[in-house]
Amino acid sequence: MILCLPSRPRSATTAASACFLFAISVASLRGQAPVFSEDFESGSLNQAVWKTTELGNATVTVQQTQVAHGKSALQIHYPQGEKSFAFVVASHLPDAVRNHFFGRAYLYISPTMPAGHDVLLNAGTPGYPISNFLEIGASGGKNVMVSYQQNAANIPRNETLARGILYPVGRWFCLEWEFQDHPDRVTTWIDGEPAGELKDFVVKPRAPRAPKADPKAKADATETAPMPAAALQTEVAGTDLVKGFSDFSFGFHAWGAGAKEDFDIYYDDIVIDTKRVGPAK
């Protein structure tokens, strides 16, 4: 049962968000549930939990045809030729996962991802893609690529990455990860095995400003107005770069070449917690 006890009048959205936070916090304290979980079994997106971010013709739906467990899963559909993005974003999670957390999701890639820089999930500041975040994506549409992306407005651009193993395609697989902001670090596992890791890095600016939100622009595209030389960032250690995870996003974004054919990314059984989650039981 979920209890909601507002101390003063509030909007329906604010009340729903507070109710959501209260429910997951109490469950966590009792040891009955992780900090956050979503299995999509309601058959639709809970608007008190998720907001949808879409640009172009990529779409987000909850469907019942391709599922890992239960009867429903999230589908990101990407049409041929598109360079757009579509994500579901949770932004009301407790402070317990603001600087360090573990995650797990079941993914299904069909039939494959487009070549280039692909984004699957990330956590960072609001306003994606003009934001700072840690990311799990793909390199060349095939290999795990983990990265720190410094894309917020009016600061030097940075992209620091590491490549890992090949993604499975045409089947469900269990993706686990650990995101940490002090120091900044990304660790991933696929079906329980190490898949890719980014750690012990330094920030080396690549461009004066962040990329434009236009998905047709390259990831390192720059604004026309240059930043003053004094504002350019010197090389710094990779720690406290994100400055806290406030938005947790799941979906797909193709920065590079457009898709050569229609494809779909499915998500199921998403969990975020303060300890490693492991496979669904």
Map each language-model feature to its residues.
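N-terminal secretory signal peptides that target proteins for export/translocation
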Residues: M1-A12
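Bacterial N-terminal signal peptides
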Residues: A15-A27
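Extracellular, beta-strand-rich glycan-interacting domains
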Residues: E38, D262-G278
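Extracellular glycan-recognition surfaces and repeat-rich motifs
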Residues: S44-I76
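Secretory/extracellular carbohydrate-interaction modules
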Residues: I76-Q149, D273-K275
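Short, aromatic/His-centered strand-loop micro-motif at the edge of beta-sheets
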Residues: Q150-C174
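Localized edge beta-strand/strand-to-loop motifs within extracellular or lumenal beta-rich domains
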Residues: R171-T187
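Flexible glycan-contacting loops in extracellular carbohydrate-active proteins
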Residues: D200-I265
